[in-house]
A protein has these predicted regions:
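Short hydrophobic alpha-helix segments
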Residues: 28-31, 81, 150
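Glycine-rich phosphate-binding loop of actin/hexokinase-like ATP-binding domains
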Residues: 122-181
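A charged helix-plus-loop insertion that forms the helical arch/lid used to bind
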Residues: 75-86
Length: 318
């Protein structure tokens, strides 16, 4: 069986895996980083390739998922604010180093491909993945094909505005973007926004700077009034964004991944009726909303799958 190296470049860590054509992760490495440089990526990939070769695995290609705007035809990172990279020739650098095919794409698109091929989206033709973490990443599959857009920018679902007049300021500079309202960061901001109504709340008593979306969610599950109010507003905004996605794409399935998805049924059961109420132009209940099946492995599995398929872009694309 052919294998590929799948690499997921995160803001504070790199995950590298050897993945087979069946989508099974055979070896996996996690590397915590303070500042990601090209040399670090090269050394991590080299170590992973050596592991595979020590076990007589046939490494056919390398796939990289990176945050930012990626030229999927050349493998260049056009712009990645996470790493302060601009027009960085990541694909070319790795191809010269290892003399095997290397393919680079946006990390959320890679995760979408992984979930579509081997996770929640398997067996569907129209599928959307949303990753709720610090921000909101995403990817769209339409009629069985990953939607890339004219310049590889399709799927930036996190930056459509759901509260343009009364929302939080997004990192992109706009007001009320989906990710500003319904990401893990958005949940924290909701907690601070409703805090004046809960002057005796214990949620912010200790180290407010360390408040996390996980802490808020757990407190909401335990019935804390402050956390419940923040969670209610967060779920309302999540429902708005999901209803918009259904109107835009009309997928069979929306999978929710990322750190916030660990809320599981507590999140899904709360958001589904609101989405149904907001869905007007397509038949209600025709889109299922589920927690993504592959979890943190989706990016690596998708990157490796992309590499084994020969990339995301065909040779005739201009």
């Amino acid at each position: 069986m052919r294998t590929a190296i799948g690499v997921d470049l995160g803001g504070s860590h790199v995950s590298a895996s050897v993945v087979g054509e069946d989508g099974i992760v055979q070896y996996q490495h996690e590397h915590d980083l303070d500042d990601l440089q090209f040399d670090t990526v090269v050394s991590i990939v080299a170590a992973t390739i050596q592991l595979a070769r020590n076990d007589d695995k046939n490494v056919a290609a390398i796939g990289i998922g990176s945050p930012g705007n990626i030229d999927a035809s050349s493998g260049a990172v056009l712009y990645s604010p996470n790493f302060r990279w601009s027009n960085a020739p990541l694909g070319e650098t790795l191809r010269k180093q290892f003399s095997i095919p290397v393919f680079v794409a946006n990390d959320a698109r890679c995760a979408t491909l992984g979930e579509f091929a081997f996770g929640t989206g398997k067996g569907t033709k129209d599928f959307v993945l949303l990753t709720l973490g610090t921000g909101i990443g995403g990817g769209i599959v339409a009629n069985g094909a990953l939607v890339l857009g004219n310049r590889w920018g399709a799927g930036e679902i996190g930056h459509h505005q759901i509260r343009p007049t009364d929302g939080f300021v997004c990192g992109c500079g706009k007001i009320g973007c989906f990710e500003a309202q319904a990401s893990g960061t958005g949940l924290i901001r909701h907690a601070f926004a409703v805090a004046p109504s809960f002057p005796r709340s214990a949620l912010l008593d200790r180290s407010p700077a360390k408040l996390s979306s996980k802490k808020i969610r757990k407190a909401a599950q335990e019935g804390d009034g402050h956390a419940c109010a923040a969670w209610k507003n967060f779920i309302g905004d999540l429902a708005l964004g999901l209803a918009n996605v259904i109107a835009f794409v009309n997928p069979q399935t929306i999978a929710i991944g990322g750190g916030v998805s660990t809320a599981g049924d507590f999140m899904i059961d709360a958001v589904k009726p609101l989405v149904d109420a907001l869905t007007t132009m397509v038949p209600k209940g025709t889109t299922t909303i589920e927690v993504a099946a592959l979890g943190n492995d989706a990016g690596q599995v998708g990157a490796a799958t992309m590499a084994l398929q020969g990339g995301l872009v065909d040779e005739n694309r201009t």
